[in-house]
């Protein structure tokens, strides 16, 4: 302990978790002293080169500065370092090299959590760290701590290896845990922490919280209280003066030190080092001042415990019957163990056989304990504590039934439309006559098993034992024999003869198993012997009478046990003085006898507890050290008082002061056992954690008890609702030691209880199931092989890995060959169904046919087989045979009265009819299935019921009535919500979203259900779906057209943007940036529009995909092109960015589209001359692509531009070219209307621009013909008026003018136009050249 332990050897535990008992051991004058000095001295020992934290060459510097320079002591810093960087690495276990593929996956998950860090903060909270930031690009997490307790817990968890697995459980998906064993062992997630930074953080938090304990170079533990200016050397520290956190602290030497001693201590204390967090906590626990005088000083010496023989170093005369008298050189056999730092031990004189307490300082041990495990456990029975009553054989049976049980063997399987649609095309055809080699091998194995099946008994008996721990969940491994008598209240308790059975029983000279209940803290012995006593007061009086009878008869052992019992009863009622008298009498009755060592331990422990509570310093000095020696040195002693924990805490303080890791480990084990026995498991946590770390740091070989200890720790974490710590603890247990069968199954159970939802079968269990298989023995293990393989098959199938599931189920079939006919058939049916799910329906048909041919299935199994055969036949395209098989299955279900199977059979019939195109018949069968399902409990058939309702709703929306289909969708959603199945809820909501967006559009309902779907996507942690939904909801709000809706759309767009960034979906990200820019354009926030568009363009260019760039540039131009302001900005996006990309990539269609947009935009912006270039380009591209419609559009736009530029003849030419490309004959009214408009424009061009009334009249008449054909009266009125004017004023044809005028008047009357004028002057104003010359 000369150097501060590194991060891997710090074993902190939560300050508030352990029992609050007295601190320290006997007089702590030499154990804990006070050093008054500058705190910075603690770090002076480290030079600059030691203070710098090592940085790997391939790592970037931390994203956040965790603190000042490493070589600066915290007390000299302006800010205490409380931040820590966690570096996450994906490595290969054997070579320790990085795994680039897994590292990328890890970085992707970190990126997701960087956007939404709530789950990461939750996991780090379990590790007692506070999340500051995530830097996914550097694979780093920055955490901080605010208290010493937090850094203590975190460093403990990290040292135990929990941080690696906690973060792996969070960051890795379920597929990672389903890797094959070779792959699983190959890769791992590791969390690296800078040890120097962790040390500085720990020390700075210690300084912030007040005085703390340090180890000085003279190997003494002292308290660091403050700067050197506070005093001139070690000072006495009494009571709470300067104790850590204001608690009572150990007292130092009461006599003032001499100057020479003072200066020497100051000199040796030049470079003290803080104790590790666990020792800080153990010494901080408030102690009683009377403990100062107990047991003498603790001097650092031999830290090893000792067993076996010892030789006396000097003569010793015992001061009482319980103390051994011996002479120097005598041999003494130690009973149990001699614990360093304790002044007493129990021994037997080799020559005389006398047993008593021996002064540890007066003997020399011949057998020091070299192995830590031998110091922790003094016999084999103590090791059983970790697995005692935790996981019984019945628990294991129930677990395997839950894991391996499947409805496929007893309940008809529903033919899912989704599964059928995913069947491979070749498997829908008639199967080929010859199967591949692998299916042939499977079929051969099936036939072999069926042959063996015929010779097996129908209902074999399960083995009486699976070889698991024999302890049940509530029965101890040591089942004491109950006494064979029972005393009633009416008996004469003063007559020794009447009490002979009780007194003779209690007067046994040694320990018997039935005495365990007498010494136990709960006193179960009383309830078994004195059943008729309901009043404890009356019982105490009767026992007092029995005590008198024992005393009168001279039965000393009975007297001692009765006095002990009376003392316990008085102590329970807080009659401490009376209890002390009884315990003292019990001690006196023993007369130094150690025949019943457990009784001696119980008496001393209870008496020491009473003396401490009564503050009896003198008696404590005599009894407490001996009680501690008995508690630590006696193997498998019985916990007899709750105050035993205080004595063990005192022994732990002395072990820390004496720097004996073996004594510390023994004390931690006993404290953990004590608290677990008292149903205080959370108080045992710090001691279990410290025990595991002590064993790890000792370099001792792995042992079986370690696995059980980790699992006990995991069970306590589970009680504290720390699921990630549970999973990590279980994983570490499996990696550190080769677990037993019971331990592996116990691990599976813990994972099932603590795995995050919504995984009902978490993939993490696969590792422990395979471990259980590896631990099976050839004898009893054979019965478990089948259920374990079946459990693995169900697990892999649940997660969609049907290939490995088939392999495991095949092995389960082979392993269950002796399990009985029904079990074999069930396994074969399950195997066939897995082949169906895997898209191998022909193989499934062959397996099921083999079962049928063997004639071994029961009637209900025949129904299941018939239904499954029908499903497989349907998927291979044999509809008729499938219908026949469904009918057989339905008939079996009706004969057996199985309503659920009838409902599934009818639903399958409906799906088959729908597949065959008989939708009305399908609807009939589905309705019948719904009627049956509605009568069944949802717990049995909820998922199938939901699926059938969705199927029926889909059918109704297709063929009507659609409103009824909506009702079935809503019913399905209610059923899924009631049974709490998220996947079913998601499917139902998706159907409702489609219904309200496509079948019966409703914007409000569509938004509501999309938002519900979004919440469900968050529950199942599907980020891809979540991003898509956010994008869709944004579009929905955008379509509402209100400012509030636009702001909501912007919010959803930004959320989707964050997800797309995390998922590295660059295309989606670019579109999201652009969508946000579009919404800002609608909200008229112009300064943000350009910014978001620019970022979108940068993202598109980052991908290096010119097609994406082209799409983005065009879409950016569309924002302005479709808007009402700043439309000129669209020109640069179209002309300068998108069009060159379209030319470069050879995308002629995009080039044509852009040219058309530019022509239209430039025409609107009054720049027809510039538009001509793009109009000609559009025309050329249209001709090249053979697109007649776009060619006609191009000619039309060219004509319009030429018209605007005043080029009448060119405009006439292009209009005529456009008309020549129209369909002939005309098909639609729109085409006729186009003729009307174009001929009108041509007439105007000829009349006004080319000054040719005659040709203009011709175009007008063509327009009139089209208008008459169309029946457009307004157009006819307009054209008739024009013709009347031309013929009246310019062509001077009065007859035609009158005709056209009358026609115009007729349409004017019909259209309620009051007057039709033929004024020549306005026309002359429009076209001066048309004005007639005056007569001369």
Curated annotation (Swiss-Prot):
Q: What is this protein called?
A: SH3 domain and tetratricopeptide repeat-containing protein 1
List modified residues, type N-acetylmethionine: 1
Q: Which SMART domains match?
A: SH3 (SM00326), TPR (SM00028)
Record's compositionally biased regions (Gly residues): 18-27
Give all residue intervals belonging to the SH3 domain. Answer: 305-368
Could you confirm whether the keyword Lyase appears in this record? no
Please list the residue ranges that the record marks as compositionally biased, kind Low complexity.
62-74, 247-266
Residue ranges annotated as compositionally biased, kind Basic and acidic residues, are 46-61
Any stretches that span the bilayer, and where are they?
A: none
Q: Which domain of life is it from?
A: Eukaryota
Protein's organism: Homo sapiens (Human)
């Amino acid at each position: 302990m000369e150097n501060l332990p590194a991060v891997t050897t710090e074993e902190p535990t939560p300050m508030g978790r352990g029992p609050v008992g007295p601190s320290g051991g006997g007089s702590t004058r030499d154990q804990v002293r006070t050093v008054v000095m500058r705190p910075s001295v603690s770090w002076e020992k480290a030079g600059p080169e030691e203070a710098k934290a090592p940085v790997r060459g391939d790592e970037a510097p931390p994203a956040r500065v965790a603190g000042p320079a490493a070589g600066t002591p915290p007390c000299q810093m302006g800010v205490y370092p409380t931040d820590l960087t966690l570096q996450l690495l994906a490595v290969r276990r054997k070579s320790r090299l990085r795994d680039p593929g897994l590292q990328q996956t890890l970085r992707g998950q970190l990126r997701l959590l960087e956007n939404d860090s709530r789950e990461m903060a939750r996991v780090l909270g379990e590790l007692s760290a506070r999340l500051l930031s995530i830097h996914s690009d550097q694979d780093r997490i920055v955490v901080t701590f605010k208290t010493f307790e937090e850094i203590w817990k975190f460093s403990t968890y990290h040292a135990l290896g929990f941080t690696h697995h906690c973060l792996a459980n969070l960051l890795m998906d379920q597929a990672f845990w389903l890797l094959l064993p070779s792959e699983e062992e190959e890769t791992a997630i590791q969390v690296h922490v800078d040890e120097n930074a962790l040390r500085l953080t720990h020390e700075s938090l210690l300084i912030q919280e007040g005085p703390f304990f340090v180890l000085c170079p003279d190997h003494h533990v002292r308290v660091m209280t403050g700067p050197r200016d506070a005093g001139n050397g070690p000072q006495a520290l009494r009571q709470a003066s300067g104790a850590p956190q204001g608690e009572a602290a150990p007292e130092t030497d009461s006599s003032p030190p001499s100057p020479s001693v003072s200066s020497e201590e100051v000199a040796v204390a030049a470079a003290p080092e803080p104790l590790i967090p666990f020792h800080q906590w153990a010494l901080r626990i408030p102690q009683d001042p009377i403990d100062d005088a107990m047991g003498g000083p603790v001097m650092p010496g031999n830290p090893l415990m000792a067993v076996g023989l010892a030789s006396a170093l000097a003569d010793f005369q015992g001061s009482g019957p319980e103390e051994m008298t011996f002479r120097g050189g005598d041999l003494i056999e130690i009973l149990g163990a001699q614990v360093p730092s304790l002044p007493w031990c129990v021994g037997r004189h080799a020559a005389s056989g006398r047993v008593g307490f021996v002064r540890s300082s007066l003997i020399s041990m011949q057998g020091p304990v070299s192995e830590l495990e031998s110091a922790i456990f003094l016999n084999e029975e103590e090791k059983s504590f970790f697995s005692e009553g935790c996981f019984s054989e019945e628990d294991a049976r129930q677990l395997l039934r839950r894991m391996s049980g499947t409805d496929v063997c007893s309940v008809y399987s529903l033919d899912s439309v989704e599964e059928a649609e995913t069947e491979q095309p070749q498997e829908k055809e008639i199967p080929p006559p010859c199967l591949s080699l692998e299916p042939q091998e499977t079929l051969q194995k099936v036939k072999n098993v069926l042959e063996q099946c015929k010779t097996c008994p129908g209902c074999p008996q399960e083995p009486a034992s699976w070889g698991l721990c024999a302890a049940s969940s509530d029965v101890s491994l040591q089942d004491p024999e109950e006494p064979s008598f029972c005393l009633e209240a009416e008996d004469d308790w003063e007559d020794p003869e009447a009490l002979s059975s009780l007194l003779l029983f209690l007067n046994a000279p040694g320990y018997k198993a039935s005495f365990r209940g007498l010494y136990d803290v709960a006193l179960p012995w009383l309830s078994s012997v004195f059943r008729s006593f309901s009043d404890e007061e009356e019982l105490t009086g009767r026992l007092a009478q029995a005590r008198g009878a024992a005393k009168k008869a001279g039965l000393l052992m009975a007297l001692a046990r009765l006095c002990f019992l009376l003392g316990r009863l008085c102590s329970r009622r807080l009659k401490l003085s009376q209890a002390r008298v009884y315990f003292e009498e019990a001690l006196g009755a023993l007369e130094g006898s150690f025949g019943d060592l457990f009784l001696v331990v119980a008496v001393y422990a209870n008496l020491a507890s009473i003396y401490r509570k009564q503050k009896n310093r003198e008696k404590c000095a005599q009894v407490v050290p001996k009680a501690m020696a008995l508690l630590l040195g006696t193997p498998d002693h019985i916990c007899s008082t709750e105050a035993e924990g205080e004595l063990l805490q005192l022994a732990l303080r002395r072990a820390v002061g004496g720097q004996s890791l073996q004594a510390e480990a023994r004390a931690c084990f006993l404290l953990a056992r004590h608290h677990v026995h008292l149903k205080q498991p959370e108080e045992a946590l710090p001691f279990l954690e410290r025990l595991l770390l002590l064993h790890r740091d000792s370099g001792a070989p792995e042992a079986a008890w370690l696995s059980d200890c980790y699992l006990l720790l995991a069970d306590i974490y589970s009680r504290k609702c720390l699921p990630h710590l549970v999973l990590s603890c279980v994983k570490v247990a499996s990696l550190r030691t080769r677990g037993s069968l019971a331990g592996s199954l116990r691990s599976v159970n813990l994972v099932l209880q603590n795995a995050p939802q919504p995984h009902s079968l978490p993939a993490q269990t696969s590792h422990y199931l395979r471990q259980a298989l590896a631990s099976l023995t050839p004898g009893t293990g054979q019965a478990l092989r089948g259920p374990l393989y079946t459990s693995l098959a169900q697990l892999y199938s649940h997660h969609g890995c049907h290939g490995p599931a088939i392999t495991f189920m095949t092995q389960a079939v082979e392993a269950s060959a002796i399990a009985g006919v029904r079990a074999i058939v069930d396994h074969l049916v399950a195997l066939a169904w897995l082949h169906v799910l895997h898209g191998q329906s022909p193989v499934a048909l062959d397996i099921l046919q083999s079962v049928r041919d063997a004639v071994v299935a029961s009637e209900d199994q025949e129904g299941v087989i018939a239904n499954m055969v029908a499903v497989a036949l349907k998927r291979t395209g044999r509809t008729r045979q499938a219908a026949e098989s469904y009918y057989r299955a339905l008939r079996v279900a009706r004969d057996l009265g199985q309503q659920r199977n009838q409902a599934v059979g009818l639903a399958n019939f409906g799906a088959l009819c729908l597949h065959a195109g008989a939708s009305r018949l399908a609807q009939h069968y589905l309705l019948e299935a719904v009627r049956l399902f509605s009568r069944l409990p949802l717990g049995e058939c909820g998922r199938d019921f939901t699926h059938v309702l969705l199927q029926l709703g889909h059918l109704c929306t297709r063929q009507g009535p659609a409103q009824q289909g909506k009702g079935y969708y809503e019913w399905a959603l209610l059923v899924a919500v009631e049974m709490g199945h998220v996947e079913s809820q998601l499917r139902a909501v998706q159907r409702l979203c489609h219904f309200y967006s496509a079948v019966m559009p409703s914007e409000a309902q569509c938004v509501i259900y999309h938002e519900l779907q979004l919440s469900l996507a968050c529950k199942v942690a599907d980020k891809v779906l979540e991003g898509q939904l956010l994008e869709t909801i944004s579009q929905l709000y955008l379509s509402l057209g209100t400012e509030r809706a636009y702001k909501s759309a912007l919010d959803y767009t930004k959320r989707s943007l964050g997800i797309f960034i995390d998922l590295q979906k660059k295309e989606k990200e670019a579109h999201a940036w652009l969508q946000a820019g579009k919404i800002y354009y609608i909200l008229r926030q112009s300064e943000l529009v350009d910014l978001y568009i620019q970022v979108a363009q940068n993202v598109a260019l980052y991908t290096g995909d010119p097609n994406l760039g082209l799409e983005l540039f065009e879409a950016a131009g569309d924002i302005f092109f479709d808007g009402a302001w700043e439309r000129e900005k669209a020109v640069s996006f179209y002309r300068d960015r998108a069009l060159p990309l379209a030319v470069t990539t050879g995308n002629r269609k995009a080039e044509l589209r852009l040219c058309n947009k530019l022509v239209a935009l430039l025409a609107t912006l009054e720049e027809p001359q510039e538009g001509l270039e793009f109009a000609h380009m559009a025309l050329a591209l249209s001709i090249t692509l053979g697109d007649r419609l776009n060619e006609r559009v191009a000619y039309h736009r060219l004509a319009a531009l030429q018209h605007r530029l005043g080029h009448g003849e060119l405009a006439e030419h292009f209009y005529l070219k456009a008309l020549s490309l129209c369909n002939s004959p005309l098909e639609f009214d729109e085409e006729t209307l186009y003729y009307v408009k174009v001929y009108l424009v041509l007439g105007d061009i000829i009349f006004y621009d080319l000054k040719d009334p005659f040709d203009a009249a011709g175009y007008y008449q063509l327009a009139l013909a089209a208008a008459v054909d169309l029946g457009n009266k307004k157009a006819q009125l307009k054209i008739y008026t024009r013709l009347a004017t031309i013929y009246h004023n310019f062509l001077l044809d009065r007859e035609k003018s009158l005709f056209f005028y009358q026609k115009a008047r007729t349409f004017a009357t019909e259209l309620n136009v009051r007057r039709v004028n033929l004024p020549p002057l306005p026309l002359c104003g429009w076209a001066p050249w048309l004005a007639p010359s005056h007569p001369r």
